[in-house]
Amino acid sequence: MLIVEGMPLLYLELAVGQRMRQGSIGAWRTISPYLSGVGIASLVVSFLASVYFNVINTWALWYLFHSFQDPLPWSVCPLNSNHTGYDEECEKASSTQYFWYRKTLNISPSIQENGGVQWEPALCLTLAWLMVYLCILRGTESTGKVVYFTTSLPYFVLIIYLVRGLTLHGATNGLGMFTPKIEQLANPKAWINAATQIFFSLGLGCGGLIAFASYNEPSNDCQKHALIVSVINSTTAIFSSIVTFSIYGFKATFNYENCLNKVILLLTNSFDLEDGFLTVSNLEEVKNYLASTYPNKYSEVFPHIRNCSLESELDTAVQGTGLAFIVYTEAIKNMEVSQLWSVLYFFMLLTLGMGSMVGTGTAILTPLTDSKIISSYLPKEAISGLVCLLNCAIGMVFTMEAGNYWFDLFNDYTATLSLLLIVLVETIAVCYVYGLKRFESDLRAMTGRTLSWYWKVMWAFVSPLLIVGLFIFYLSDYILTGTLQYQAWDATQGHVVTKDYPTYALAVIGLLVASSTMCIPLVALGTFVTRHFKIREQFSAA
Amino acid sequence: MLWALFFLVTTIHAELCHPDAENAFKVRLSIRAALGDKAYVWDTDQEYLFRAMVAFSMRKVPNREATEISHVLLCNITQRVSFWFVVTDPSNNYTLPAAEVQSAIRKNRNRINSAFFLDDHTLEFLKIPSTLAPPMEPSVPVWIIVFGVIFCIVTVAIALLVLSGIRQRRRNNKGPPGVEDAEDKCENIITIENGIPCDPLDMKGGHINDGFLTEDERLTPL
């Protein structure tokens, strides 16, 4: 997927930016005036993405600030009102889940119940946006220096975590997940997930790559850069997955052993066996013995005995915010000197998030500062300030009690279809509208390198077909599943339940997708109409 | 005769203390879980100590200062180790109310635990909830302090950058016109007059050549 899809598309975007020397709107307008809608669509997608993405930085800041306590606040459950036991919700779920759902998000039972804006996340969101503003304030002059830091620190922390992770008890169980299951490779869903992952991790279609490339020297060898960047991207992904899997194995082993201990305790207490008699090794035989000797009592106790299995613990695949804030914190609280590991981890998360925000911010600002209309009225600092302020104001939605549900909604639906469509139109535009031969000669004039046949084939045929395939798959998936659903936290039961989206949420989803995809045809139509009228005017004047 | 009396006393004891008796509490110890290799064996001497600790706790209750070790009865001792106990009044006729026993045990829980090197989890009194220590709450939550520090640093940095940007722009506006921003992508547009850039014609560094006529003298005065 990397070779077939990632590298060609990355090279294409870098080359377009370097050649046109403008942000996304201007670049596509130069290729063809009908296609400036592509640039606008990129801008809209980047804007929507930046609105919801900074909320992750908010949460990272929140956890970072809370890591300076002993013990860590998510490692112990708070007491209930009369101090006789632990809080009920915390008992049913785990302390890390409780801290995430109750203390951080204060989540409501469903997306309809909005609740009010909560001041603690709102403060952290404001701070997060101030930090982003600080980084993109001066444009690429400052972002270049910031990015040196935000890119190198995560590697440093990952190496530390790699060493720590591999030495944890039970880490090898998680690393066993690395062996690819051959039958999964035959499943087309796996390939589709791989294609989507490459697509979004490289940031294609957001306009950020074009914006950054437009600041390059014209003679810059963007082919070499495209290759290096995509290879490093994938290597980093594999590297961080080693760390993740070892931490995962540690957590799964820990939970499995806890589960076994609970079963042992339950049996010891119910049958008044000698303390320490039941161990992990003789558990099964003793269970059978008890079942045969005291059948009545055993059948009473049996419903409470959970079947502990290491495989099921490992199989609970989590991704996204669940992985970062629940699974990792659970693993961290069991390590020694957990405050240090926690601070390191959330600082790394913060720098990664800031790096992404800087990229998205540049993708938004470059077209705005390039356009003569806006930049003649306002200086660069004011434009970035206004954009940050607007984003922060809209982002307050995500600090409400139902905010996490809206976040998931934005996360799942903002970028998927729109980016696929944008990149498809980009590839077709460069190859067929602008002309592959013309682009090739432009590149040769700029960089002095000839375009090899591999890139030509990829750009003209393979990548567009692949994207069309992905697009069709996602559309059919959405249509076939009927109503879209989301995961809601049930405080009374202590785990997530699936609920349907209400109609207005579905309307918002439709609006999100439409606002970016409709730009392309609408602007094309608009340009056509205005041109048509201009030509008519010229004819009638003559 | 003596045998009959002994039999009577044991029967009364058996009636007072049995599983789920009125005012009886079940106790459960997990010695090996708590102490591992250093675990001691639970024998009659340990039971004696337990009865002594319960009697000690009851003596702290007003009106019960006369409680003796013999008034604490244990029964149904299992290998777990678990057993039931009751506290009787001095006449050994009835058991003391559960509420009194419960409050006495709760008040002295730490002493009882430490006598056996155990804690609330490994020495359990079923139906007597233990009072958990509340977590330490500092007066100002720590996170607000850290937040405040970082917030101030970021605001100051932004203010500095914005001010320096404004100052630089003001200096540029006063300086030679036509020179654009440093990080511009296009080449600097330098106003050109007859192929000679205007900048070097600035009088700042050069000497005035008096051979040339100044502006006023070109037109000879009348």
UniProtKB/Swiss-Prot annotation, chain B:
The modification Phosphothreonine is found at T214, T220. The record marks F125, L126 as: Cleavage by BACE2. Disruption phenotype: Deficient mice are viable and fertile but exhibit a severe defect in renal amino acid uptake due to down-regulation of apical amino acid transporters in the kidney. Greater urine output, more dilute urine, a defect in urinary concentration, higher osmolar clearance and an increase in free water absorption, suggesting an osmotic diuresis. Decreased urine osmolytes sodium and urea, presence of tyrosine and glutamine crystals in the urine, and increased excretion of amino acids in the urine, suggesting an aminoaciduria. Residues 163-222 are cytoplasmic. InterPro entries: Collectrin, Collectrin_dom. Induction: Up-regulated by high glucose concentration in beta-cells (at protein level). GO terms for molecular function: protein homodimerization activity; transporter activator activity. Glycosylated. Glycosylation is required for plasma membrane localization and for its cleavage by BACE2. Proteolytically processed in pancreatic beta cells by BACE2 leading to the generation and extracellular release of soluble CLTRN, and a corresponding cell-associated C-terminal fragment which is later cleaved by gamma-secretase. This shedding process inactivates CLTRN. Three cleavage sites have been identified for BACE2, two clustered sites after Phe-116 and Leu-118 and a more membrane proximal site at Phe-125; the preferred BACE2 cleavage site seems to be between Phe-125 and Leu-126, Phe-116 and Leu-118 act as alternative sites. It is a single-pass type I membrane protein. Residues 15-141 are extracellular. The cleavage site containing the double Phe-Phe motif acts as negative regulator of shedding by BACE2. Belongs to the CLTRN family. This is Collectrin. It comes from Mus musculus. The gene is Cltrn.
